Amino acid sequence: LFLTSRSQPAFLLIGFNAGANDYVTKPFDTSEFLARIRTLLHMKRSVRERLDIEMAFIQAQIKPHFLYNTLNTIASLSEVDPDRTRDLLADFGSYLQSSFDLRNLDQEVPFEKEWTLVQSYLNIEKARFGSRIQLTTEVPDEAEFVLPPLTIQPIVENAVRHGVLKKIEGGHIHISVEEIGDYAWISVRDTGEGIPPLKREAILDGTYRLGIGLVNVNRRLKNTYGQGLLIDSVEGTGTLIRFRVPLKQNKEAER
């Protein structure tokens, strides 16, 4: 909220570009000024509540059968490979902890935190499906930026569940992170069944109703950065899903 003695569009535009959401012209009435402040605070609370509900909904989508199957895998391994069982239990614990972390609902999280969740998820799935999931990564050790929570993992899960595991022989998943100009580009490529054109369009325009993973990620990226997912897919061949995170904002936050 900003105060101004000028109401011409050009001057108001300067204020809005600087981050203001509303304005009051001078001289102003105190009751009007306080009413507008209350309205803006109410809007802020409403946005936070919506984020809380949205993230709770995302977390509720963790499929019960995934939990059951993971526990069954751990139980089976415990009889033949105790060391691997311990590792898988650690991955499972890390996965659950990251998936249900409610402390950063309306914030961005370090890439390292999101990457730990992805690795835990993939370790669990590889323990279950073995060589059907072939994985390669190009993720630099020095990758340091922030992004919305639960952003990469749903894309990777889509590559596993609706990509390579749709083929009897499985397939390959490649995850890369690359800094290009002012952006960090995150890419997930798979050699799975591909996404039909109509489904791809429905995911990107938010009308797809059979699953919320990619739809939700795309919407949150648009709300945060102004650009969502880029999806290239060929049926029967595979899918490439990419998105970018501005590094400039990250570097300014560090200062």
Question: How would you describe each model-predicted region?
Answer:
Residues 231-235:
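A short beta-strand-to-loop motif within the catalytic HATPase_c
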Residues 25, 38-62, 66-230:
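Two-component histidine phosphotransfer core
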Residues 6-7, 40:
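Short, conserved "switch-loop" micro-motifs in signal-transduction and mechanochemical regulators
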Residues 8, 13-17:
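Alpha4-beta5-alpha5 "output face"
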Residues 10-11, 27-37:
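C-terminal output helix
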Residues 171, 237-239:
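Glycine-rich GHKL/ HATPase_c ATP-binding element in histidine kinases
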